[in-house]
From Swiss-Prot:
Keywords: Isomerase, tRNA processing. NCBIfam families: TruB. This is tRNA pseudouridine synthase B. It comes from the Bacteria. Its EC number is 5.4.99.25. The active site is at residue 38. Belongs to the pseudouridine synthase TruB family. Type 1 subfamily. The keyword Isomerase applies. The keyword Transcription regulation does not apply. GO terms for molecular function: pseudouridine synthase activity; RNA binding; tRNA pseudouridine(55) synthase activity. Responsible for synthesis of pseudouridine from uracil-55 in the psi GC loop of transfer RNAs. HAMAP family: TruB_bact.
């Protein structure tokens, strides 16, 4: 049993919770996720199973897309709906569509963002949420992120009420905290705010419409069709350039054999396949020997090569 499962992560579970539950359903210990989603967030969570756990780092896409909702009128400790209320301020004026779109435009492009205290970012070897739970505030590192697209999905021309909510879609770089974007929107509009809803609709080439639920996975296990839920390792790595080696080279790859870059591939990672179209390893350019490739991740061992 191996491959990538595109899980539609439910609300209320951590990414680790999802891995733990899948281990029980699939009766497989070698399972890992490709990046954390907050408990309140639903949507695309690629999960690697079996030998596919070796490629998890290559499936952590640089670009993610989310659809969410920001609510103005109060902020929370966690910057989302799960936290305790920190500040309240009634929205005492009408906010126009033009105002909101102007703010979203200002937040599009390369910007700086400070991660929230309730996050897994490490400071001095300790995760920020550990400081937050202990009631400690520490200096947080500012990170540079890229917002590729920030679109207002709500079709209203004006927003009125003590608490105002509106929906958005954002495509952003890896490491972006969307709940912090919700706070930044509120700051620019002059009101405390938080992210009241969020779903990840895409992680790189993996889309929400292709994801399956825990219930669907369990149904496939019971029906004996569990293999149908997996994206193969080869398919998951199809975005990378491909080299094919002969049987003799395939035997040596497991021992870390260097390869000549005969195809003059310039991409940072190259997948290496045998003549049976099985991915053996992922290679990268050798830093000291131009024109040579060195193994970054070997996916087969002696036993697997004999299969």
């Amino acid at each position: 049993m191996e491959g990538v499962v595109l899980l539609h992560k439910p609300k209320g579970m951590t990414s680790h919770d999802c891995v733990f539950k899948l281990r029980k359903i699939l009766r497989e210990k070698r399972i890992g996720h490709t990046g954390t989603l907050d408990p309140d967030v639903t949507g695309v969570l690629p999960i690697c199973v079996g030998r596919a756990t070796k490629i998890a780092q290559f499936l952590t896409s640089e670009t993610k897309t989310y659809e969410g909702e920001v609510t103005l009128g109060f902020s929370t400790t966690t910057e989302d709906a799960s936290g305790e209320v920190v500040e309240t301020k009634n929205v005492d004026r009408t906010i126009t569509r033009m105002e909101v779109e102007k703010v979203l435009a200002e937040l599009t492009g390369t910007i700086e963002q400070m991660p929230p205290m309730f996050s897994a970012v490490k400071v001095n070897g300790k995760k920020l949420y550990e400081y937050a739970r202990a009631g400690q505030e520490v200096e947080r590192p500012v990170r540079t992120i890229t917002i590729h697209e920030f679109v207002l999905l709500d079709d209203r021309e004006v927003f009125e009420g003590e608490n105002i909510s509106f929906r958005f879609r954002v495509t952003c770089s890896k490491g972006t905290y969307v709940r912090t974007l919700a706070v930044m929107i509120g700051e620019k509009l002059g009101f405390p705010s938080h992210m009241s809803h969020l779903v990840r609709t895409a992680s790189g080439e993996f889309l929400l419409e292709d994801c399956i639920s825990f219930e669907e996975i369990e149904e496939n296990v019971q029906n004996g069709t569990v293999e149908s839920i997996f994206i193969s390792i080869d398919e998951a790595l199809s975005k990378f350039p491909k080299m094919v080696v002969d049987e003799k080279q395939a035997e040596k790859i497991k021992n870390g054999m260097f390869l000549k870059n005969e195809l003059e591939i310039t991409a940072p990672f190259i997948t290496v396949f045998d003549k049976n179209d099985r991915c053996l390893a992922i290679y990268e350019h050798h830093p000291k020997h131009p024109g040579m490739l060195k193994p970054m991740k070997v996916l087969v061992n002696n036993q697997e090569l004999k299969l």
